Amino acid sequence: MGLYQYVRALYKDPKEFLGELYKQRIQQWRREPPIVEVERPTRIDRARALGYKPLPGIKIVRVRVRKGTRKREEIKGGRRPKAEYRIRPLGVNLQWIAEERANRLHRNMEVLGSYWVGEDGLYKWYEVILVDPFNPNIYNRPEYVWLLQKNQRGRVFRGKTSSARKFRGLRNGGLGAEKVRPSKRANFKD
């Protein structure tokens, strides 16, 4: 087994295998702001699998997202009892939210991918890989040149990243996936 396989095995159950180091990380991350730029990836195996290389023009950002559903505003007018609910499920998954927040802070970059790095009872942390497509170190490399295409601009906001495609049901096709294309909104009437 190579190095990355061992790193991957550690993160199958980080509380057990990383122990005190994992707890210390979580405690430190709680004190930090929600979006922090990091020097090097916490999980090198996931970062390299998603296309990370230590080049100028590539950044890694750790994003904190609150877990759970969201509360709506209190309904002021009269309603029948069944309609009186304040909690609604999110329309997107937490990883997609983390990618969007990272990209809103770094508007000149595009999201390459993201991965889970930790969680506690209240928060989840994701590391998001951001690429500047107009940096010469990036657009001169064949593995990143596709980010220059017009249809990849603002890709995270249009559901084109891996985690967004997974949430939208676009990872599979054929039997059972008839109504996920072009989108759920196009196929299901409200």
UniProtKB/Swiss-Prot annotation:
An annotated GO BP: cytoplasmic translation
Keywords: Ribonucleoprotein, Ribosomal protein
MF-aspect GO terms: RNA binding; structural constituent of ribosome
InterPro entries: Rbsml_eL15_core_dom_sf, Ribosomal_eL15, Ribosomal_eL15_CS, Ribosomal_uL23/eL15/eS24_sf
Entry keyword annotation includes Aminoacyl-tRNA synthetase: no
Entry annotated with the keyword Repeat: no
Pfam families: Ribosomal_L15e
Entry's Gene Ontology cellular component terms: cytosolic large ribosomal subunit
NCBIfam families for the chain: PRK04243.1
Family, similarity comment: Belongs to the eukaryotic ribosomal protein eL15 family.
Name of the protein in its database record: Large ribosomal subunit protein eL15
Originating organism: Nanoarchaeum equitans (strain Kin4-M)
